[in-house]
Amino acid sequence: MACARPLISVYSEKGESSGKNVTLPAVFKAPIRPDIVNFVHTNLRKNNRQPYAVSELAGHQTSAESWGTGRAVARIPRVRGGGTHRSGQGAFGNMCRGGRMFAPTKTWRRWHRRVNTTQKRYAICSALAASALPALVMSKGHRIEEVPELPLVVEDKVEGYKKTKEAVLLLKKLKAWNDIKKVYASQRMRAGKGKMRNRRRIQRRGPCIIYNEDNGIIKAFRNIPGITLLNVSKLNILKLAPGGHVGRFCIWTESAFRKLDELYGTWRKAASLKSNYNLPMHKMINTDLSRILKSPEIQRALRAPRKKIHRRVLKKNPLKNLRIMLKLNPYAKTMRRNTILRQARNHKLRVDKAAAAAAALQAKSDEKAAVAGKKPVVGKKGKKAAVGVKKQKKPLVGKKAAATKKPAPEKKPAEKKPTTEEKKPAA
């Protein structure tokens, strides 16, 4: 497949090049704006909607009145009467069973949307330009791998076809039948309630046949699934960009292809079939930004780059980070050193003072021991021995001694052992 520029080959009904060429219309070089296409498609699609609404009486066809307050139930209106489950049930409210919906739909909603004519034409130009790019057409899902050329133009003889078998043979010769087979394979049942509303089956989109005059071409192609037929004078954005996505596979007749310049004009000449209409211009003629920015005209107007780089320094707390503190206050190192030395000096003084006090205490204890006539105890062992000596208790005198004195145990009289003579029984 080729994307031909600026001449397009015209293909015969046998699928071969007829030898004729057509100049590529300027509309195929128009800017592709998917945002505009999507906006126009969304708004125009709303014009096919049929108004719908719920009945104005729905949910209100019962007699109900609120019970008021003081009954320990909600104040919603309740059905009158008795003898049935319905009596006493809530009514009217959107939270009630059998009540009306919230904000009942009305038929006087603003169903339709008006779109500017120039904007609609811009969308059609974008859709036509996208249909000539193989990448966009293939991304849409069309099977055009074997198609000889894009845009695909055929002879005007095709407009005179009246039989479907002729149309099928043409599509097979043009290698476009793969796209129809894709449609056949995609036919399936719709999911959801559309099945109940005469929309049971769905399928993919196939090629779009664009013609100039209907000499039977509609009857020949209309029964092939997925085919869409359009008159070149009545192009529709809903058909050229289904779903609001550009890239529809289009097959043109020669006369319809030649008529595009008259319909949409070029950038040098206005459209002859539309009043005061010119093709939309590109925002940028050259889209190679690197080439534009490096051009001498742009570089001459630019200032020289600033080589100095200002790096953001991470803010650190000088009270926790000594290196940052020394940057801010170099004397902090001296202060810190003096503090450490002062603490060491004070610690040494406390240790010396404690040692002197211990020596004085030891000397005092030695003097007392010498006065008592005891050998002075020296060292830790002596201290432990001195500590370990038990104090002798003073003897108790008087009533306390009598109370605390234990009674002496009574001695049993000693039994005499019998002698041998006593042991002998009497004769």
Curated annotation (Swiss-Prot):
Region (Disordered): 369-427
Biological processes annotated in GO: cytoplasmic translation; translation
Keyword set, alphabetical order: Acetylation, Citrullination, Cytoplasm, Isopeptide bond, Methylation, Phosphoprotein, Ribonucleoprotein, Ribosomal protein, Ubl conjugation
Keyword Cytoplasm: yes
Source organism of this protein record: Homo sapiens (Human)
Compartments (UniProt record): Cytoplasm
Name of the protein in its database record: Large ribosomal subunit protein uL4
Cross-linked sites for Glycyl lysine isopeptide (Lys-Gly) (interchain with G-Cter in SUMO2): K239, K327
